[in-house]
Amino acid sequence: MAVYAVGDLQGCLEPLQCLLEHVHFNPEHDRLWLVGDLVNRGPQSLETLRYLYGLRESLVCVLGNHDLHLLAVARKHELLKKGDTLREILEAPDRDELLGWVRRQKLMHYDAERNVAMVHAGIAPQWSLKKALKHAAEVEQALQEDQLYGAFLDGMYGNEPAKWDNDLQGVTRLRVITNYFTRMRFCTSDGKLDLKSKEGVETAIPGYAPWFSHPKRKTRELKIIFGHWAALEGRCDEPGVFALDSGCVWGGSMTLLNVDTLERHQCNCDAVGHAANGLVKSAQAGTATNPQAQEPRQ
């Protein structure tokens, strides 16, 4: 059995199918891990969700900020934004089935056999593996329990509080947990978030650094797979940390990682997220090559 992890899809189905065909993915034997942001901005958000739903028995997903945005818009807790490509999902006859499936996905996945965690954006440097799983479960419970769901979506948006505190309660507590797992790029060594900076690691403001680079990060013995940060172009020099968002929806590429061998495969994408000539490049981890994404990241 092979386990493959793929970076942000954002409604770009063609490159995913190209990659899975390239590695001869067999859903009867292999497993597919997805780092979240399954939908939005790309040309095939509805088709992507339907395709993934059909693969659900062979699939592990964690939720990204765009997936949570979809749930909020569907419940009318948030309005569609310029550039969103979610309307076709909201108007689909099978929307409730698809959205119900999205609600049941995780915020963090941990494979104990491989000692590998997968999240969308990152893990707060001050959290251990045990604490990270515990806090992810708090948000997962809010997503899956009807009596908590609406209040969570109502209070999910916002940049404050910018730092974790064990005494936080209610929706405020859930918001900061969600921001760590689905929006984080830069933070201080004690976890204070900068949610405005979205470019490369060299753009960190004084006192801040990429979440994965802090020397005292409590998950250094853990392998971590993440997406979200398109400006990294699928590259991360931190040992044991694997960045998979290579800017497919911005004309970069979509990246697939064999979780066991660490071999990478990338499908080049055009400016709107379609596969570009079906071209797939293969390389060892850390040697990804793809065009630089030129659009602003979210």
Curated annotation (Swiss-Prot):
Keywords: Hydrolase. InterPro entries: ApaH, Calcineurin-like_PHP_ApaH, Metallo-depent_PP-like. The keyword Hydrolase applies. It comes from the Bacteria. Signal peptide: none annotated. It catalyses: P(1),P(4)-bis(5'-adenosyl) tetraphosphate + H2O = 2 ADP + 2 H(+). GO terms for molecular function: bis(5'-nucleosyl)-tetraphosphatase (symmetrical) activity. Its EC number is 3.6.1.41. The keyword Hydrolase applies. Pfam families: Metallophos. Belongs to the Ap4A hydrolase family. Hydrolyzes diadenosine 5',5'''-P1,P4-tetraphosphate to yield ADP. This is Bis(5'-nucleosyl)-tetraphosphatase, symmetrical. It comes from Pseudomonas savastanoi pv. phaseolicola (strain 1448A / Race 6) (Pseudomonas syringae pv. phaseolicola (strain 1448A / Race 6)).
